[in-house]
Amino acid sequence: MHKYRTHNCNELKISDVGAEVKLSGWVHRRRDHGNLVFVDLRDHYGITQIVFTDQNPQLMDDASRLRYESVVTVIGKVVARSEETINNTLPTGHIEVLAGEFIVESAADTLPFVINTEKDAPEDSRLKHRFLDLRREKLHNNIMLRSQIISYIRQLMTARGFTEFQTPILTASSPEGARDFLVPSRLHPGKFYALPQAPQQFKQLLMVSGFDRYFQIAPCFRDEDARADRSPGEFYQLDIEMSFVTQEDIFSTIEPVMYELFTKFTDKKVSEAPFIRIPYNESMLKYGSDKPDLRNPIVIADVTEIFRDSDFTIFRENIKKGSIVRAIPAPYAAAQPRSFFDKMIEFAISEGAGGLGYIQFSETGEAKGPVAKFLSTQQLEDLKATANISNGDAVFFASDKKDKAAKLAGKVRIKLADELDLLEKDCFKFCWITDFPFYELNEETGKIDFSHNPFSMPQGGLEALENAKTTEELLELTAYQYDIVCNGIELSSGAVRNHKPEIMYKAFAIAGYSEEEVDKRFGGMIRAFKFGAPPHGGIAPGIDRIVMLLAEATNIREIIAFPLNQQAEDLLMNAPNYVEDKALKELNVMLSPSARKNAEKE
C-alpha cells in the first residue's frame, strides 16, 4: 500500500465497498455525534466522509480533537451509507470510510478565517494567507479553470499553425502607454532594463525573421493603478502575430478561437462569427463608449439638429458654442416614479454634468417632463423617429462638447440598463471596434500624440500623413487598429503594423519625435525593417479578463493565484521590500533622502 494514499478523495464509489483504502487530505469539516465522529476529508479532487466509532474509543477521541485544515492520512474500510444518509451532491456520497487508524501529517494552527465556506473575509487577510484562501472551493476552481483555459488555448493555436515562442523578460523601455518596471544593471552602471509592457517589438521582429504565425502566453508588466479588471503589476495575454495578413484575415483567425474557447467553458450563448464590426466613431455615437456592452439594447442618437432651432434655450445656446445633444432612450420608463428621474439626474451630476434633461412619452403619446414644453409637436415627432422612441418610453439628454457628451451619454446608457434591468441574460456578445483615430490631442500638453499603438499602420499610408496639414485633419486620420470587446469588457487591442521605415519616421515626426530619437528608441526594429519586412499584424487578448468572464468573477484577484493588492503589494511575500545597502551599492543605486528615511524605519 502506498505511503499516503491508494485513492484520491473524489474517487471511491459503491463498487469499492469492502476495500481497504488509504486516503490523505485536509480536515474540511468535523461533526461530533457522541458515539460517532464524522470528518470530511478534502484533497485537490474532492471530499470523502470518514467515520470514527466508539468501537475504538481512543481513535474517536483523537479524531474529535482534530483541528480544521490539519493534514491527515486515514486507513480504513469502504462501507455503504445507509439510504437516509446518502449525499447525492458528492461523487463519493454513496459511501464512507470506516477509520481503522489515522496519522496527523501536519497539525494546523488556529485559522485566520473560515476555509470550508465561501463566507467573506477581509481581503488583506486573504492575501496574506493566500495558501489558505486557495483551498476554498470557488477560488480553487477558478485557478483550475484558468489552467484549463490556457491549455485549451494552446491546442487551438497549435491546430491553426501557430508556433509558440518565448521572448525576453529583460529588455529596453518602450512607449506602450504605461510606466515601466525598471531593473538596474550591475554590469552597466547607470543603465536600466525594463520588464516588457508587451512583447510588441519582439513579435514583430519574429515576423521579419521569417516566421509566419507566432503566439505566446505572454507575461506583461505595467506599473499601473489597480482596477477591478486590471492587476497593478503583471498580467498575461494571448499574444499573436501573423505575416502577410489584412485586418480581416486577423479577424477571421481570432473569431473561431474566441467562439470555441467560450463555448468550451460555458453553457451561455456566444456570438457566432463573424462578430459585429463597429467603427470607432459609430460606437461613440451609438453607445458612448469604445467598449460597448451589446447586451444592453439602448442605442444613443444624435439629436443636435432637432434642438438647434428649438425654444429650449440651454441646448440651443450650447449648440451655438459648438456643443451637441445626444438622446438616450429609456425603454418602458415613462411610468417610472419621480424618484427614478431624480436618481438619474443625481447620477449625471456625480459624473460631472450640470444635470440631465428628460421627456416622458405616455402610452397615449403625451409628452411630459422638463424639456417637453420647449419642443413643438413636429420636433417631438422628429425626436421619437430619430431616437427610435415609442409611447411608454422616456428619453434623457446629454449636451456638451462632443467627447464629453458622448461619454456622459454612454454612462447614462449603462446606468439605465442597470436600473431598468435591461441586460440580456446568459450570453457573451462579442464585437470588433475598428477605425480608431491614429492621433489624439494630449490633454496635458495640447500637442499631437499617438492615440494607441504607435506601431499601427495609418489608413492611407504615407500619402495620408503627408496630406494632413492641420491639427483637425491629423485628428481625422484613422489607423488599422481594432479592439475586441465582450460584454462591455475590452479583451484586447490589435493592429495591422506599420512595417515601412519611411511611414514610421513620418508618423513619429508628426508626434514630435526626431528621426534620431526614433532610431535610438526603436533602433532594432527600424534596422530590421530596412532589410525586408513582411506586412504583418496581430492582437493580444487578455488571459485574465477571459478567465474573469468565464469564471463570472467580479474582481481580477479572484482568478490569479498570487495577486498583488490594490496598493501593488504582495502581502504574503512582503514585496516590495527594502534591500541591504550592499545590494544597492553593487547596482550603483542611491536612495533619495525620503526613501532612505523610510528604509531606516523598517
UniProtKB/Swiss-Prot annotation:
The keyword Aminoacyl-tRNA synthetase applies. Homodimer. The gene is aspS. Aspartyl-tRNA synthetase with relaxed tRNA specificity since it is able to aspartylate not only its cognate tRNA(Asp) but also tRNA(Asn). Reaction proceeds in two steps: L-aspartate is first activated by ATP to form Asp-AMP and then transferred to the acceptor end of tRNA(Asp/Asn). It is an enzyme of class 6 (ligase). Keywords: Aminoacyl-tRNA synthetase, ATP-binding, Cytoplasm, Ligase, Nucleotide-binding, Protein biosynthesis. Belongs to the class-II aminoacyl-tRNA synthetase family. Type 1 subfamily. This is Aspartate--tRNA(Asp/Asn) ligase. It catalyses: tRNA(Asx) + L-aspartate + ATP = L-aspartyl-tRNA(Asx) + AMP + diphosphate. The keyword Cytoplasm applies. NCBIfam families: aspS_bact (TIGR00459), PRK00476.1 (NF001750). It holds the Pfam family tRNA_anti-codon. The record marks 33 as: Important for tRNA non-discrimination. InterPro entries: Aa-tRNA-synt_II (IPR004364), aa-tRNA-synth_II (IPR006195), aa-tRNA-synth_II/BPL/LPL (IPR045864), Asp-tRNA-ligase_1 (IPR004524), Asp-tRNA-ligase_1_N (IPR047089), Asp/Asn-tRNA-synth_IIb (IPR002312), AspRS_core (IPR047090), GAD-like_sf (IPR004115). Residues 200-203 are annotated as: Aspartate. It is found in: Cytoplasm.
